[in-house]
A protein has these predicted regions:
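Extracellular/virion structural assembly segments
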Residues: 23-30, 34-37, 41
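Terminal, regulation- and interaction-focused segments at domain boundaries
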Residues: 1-19, 23-26
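A sequence-composition feature that detects small, non-aromatic residues
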Residues: 17-18, 25, 29, 45, ...
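N-terminal intrinsically disordered, cationic/polar leader segments
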Residues: 1-7, 35-37, 41-72
């Protein structure tokens, strides 16, 4: 059973998506963690020095997706 799971999906420009990824990367590099704000809930997660990263690309005839998962 999950203690907490936050999920959000929204449409944005490619540039906005790149900015979001940069913000996450900067937070991981500088602050050793990430912070999420979702429906008035603020959650901070500490991230250890070593993590597992999974990158998955899927292309279909009508849609493609890129998933990046970081776990520890």
């Amino acid at each position: 059973m999950d203690l907490l799971e936050l999920s959000e999906k929204k449409t944005m420009s490619r540039e906005e998506a790149a900015d979001l990824l940069r913000q996450l990367a900067d937070s991981l590099a500088r602050h050793n963690g990430v912070e999420f704000n979702h429906n008035g809930i603020k959650v901070q997660a500490r991230v250890p020095d070593e993590v597992t990263v999974e990158v998955e690309f899927e292309a279909e005839s009508d849609e493609s997706s890129l998933e990046i998962e970081i776990s520890w």
